[in-house]
């Protein structure tokens, strides 16, 4: 592998992966340094996206418990299933990280770990 690059981006978070993709689209030989196995940085892997997914599920559960009855929707036996919530969160993260991986491959960006 030729280790000469026009652009080396440090980090594959929201700014990093966009920078790497755009650089490659402009014809620059691009690499992205990311210490994690998966692309997307903190936001996608353990920060913003996972927490928003769990928060959304929790808010829907709360509305179902507290507000649906006011609308004539009975939810007497509603219960929270944390393993399913976590699975949904993990699927969301996986889908998005795979999307970034696809864009890196499509644009011939080298992922340096």
Question: Can you say where each PLM-predicted feature lies in the sequence?
Answer:
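Glycine-rich flavin
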Residues: 2-4, 22, 26-28, 34-113
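The conserved SAM/SAH-binding core of class I Rossmann-like methyltransferase domains
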Residues: 10, 33-34
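Hydrophobic alpha-helical segments that mediate membrane insertion or helix-helix packing
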Residues: 9, 20-23
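Beta1/beta-strand and adjacent pyrophosphate-binding region of the FAD-binding site
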Residues: 1-13
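N-terminal Rossmann-fold NAD(P) dinucleotide-binding loop
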Residues: 16-17
């Amino acid at each position: 592998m030729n280790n000469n690059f026009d652009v080396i981006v440090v980090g594959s978070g929201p700014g990093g992966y966009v920078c790497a993709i755009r650089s490659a689209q402009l014809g620059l030989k691009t690499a992205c340094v990311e210490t994690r196995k998966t692309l997307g940085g903190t936001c996608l892997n353990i920060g913003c996206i996972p927490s928003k997914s769990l928060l959304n599920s929790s808010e829907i559960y709360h509305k179902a418990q507290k507000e649906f009855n006011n609308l004539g929707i009975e939810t007497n036996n509603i219960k929270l299933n944390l393993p399913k919530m976590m699975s949904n969160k993990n699927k969301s993260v996986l889908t998005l990280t795979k999307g970034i991986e696809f864009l890196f491959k499509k644009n011939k960006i080298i992922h340096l770990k």
